[in-house]
Amino acid sequence: MDIEAYFERIGYKNSRNKLDLETLTDILEHQIRAVPFENLNMHCGEAMELGLETIFDHIVRRNRGGWCLQVNQLLYWALTTIGFQTTMLGGYVYIPAANKYSTGMIHLLLQVTIDGRNYIADAGFGSSSQMWQPLELISGKDQPQMPSIFRLTEQKGIWYLDQIRREQYIPNTEFLNSDLLPKTTHQKVYSFTLEPRKIEDFESMNTYLQTSPTSAFTTTSFCSLQTPEGVHCLVGFTLTYRIFNYKDNTDLIEFKTLIEEEVEEVLKNIFKISLGRKLVPKPGNGSFTI
């Protein structure tokens, strides 16, 4: 695996000699704007694999994306390769419909230590809950970013990530009650501990997420990609573009329902990916929000 090929894939041409917050932020921002958060393989009859060599080939050489266990593992490899002190952590995603965090450790995130300070770096949550910059690991501090205000809170060794969103404006009134829209401005995202993890700790969950009928990932095909102004999302046949802080502290969200013949073109032109096999889009049951 070639680190220069990774940097070319994400379009990163800046310095990688300084192991500082600016470099970490720059690499994270480049990856989330180049590598989609997506699970389309499993809706093309293919597996979402965890092997680093396979992930490198899939994302870097074949120009695809992946979910957190893939894109954050790739980010972990890149950061450690150039010398950042990086640790894998395991997260539990908040499920609004159940009003609780997942019982299984279904999310991979990273802790990066720079000059004695700890930061959370996560390139694998997607949609409008995706952080654009690393979050300093400080409890109770509001950390404003373009997507929203993020806040980390620690209670008895467990850390919680929340976000405070802006109001939303949806010009197409047909979608005002869409299940894809977050229902509140204050949203819980996930919880985690600082216990170091290895990728092997996620293997059984990686299988469960793409095979269990109770997994939201088996009923929902999704693809999201950050832009300098917002985020594109494709869930089933529904394409959205959210422009952050369009005006008056409000996000603008544009909706479009695609026909089957448009999906491949949208994936190529907006998300910059091409699939090797036919995609069967699935709309899900409201568990994925944009």
Swiss-Prot record:
Q: Where does substrate bind?
A: 106-107
Subcellular localization is given as: Cytoplasm
| Primary location recorded for the protein, binned into one broad class | cytoplasm
Molecular function per GO: arylamine N-acetyltransferase activity; N-hydroxyarylamine O-acetyltransferase activity
EC primary class? transferase
Organism domain of life: Eukaryota
**What GO CC terms are in its UniProt record?**
cytoplasm
Q: Where is the active site?
A: 68 (acyl-thioester intermediate), 107, 122
Q: Where does CoA bind?
A: 103-104, 208, 214, 287
Q: Tell me which EC number(s) this protein carries.
A: 2.3.1.5, 2.3.1.118
Question: Belongs to which family?
Answer: Belongs to the arylamine N-acetyltransferase family.
Name under which the protein is recorded: Arylamine N-acetyltransferase 2
What is the species of this protein? Answer: Macaca mulatta
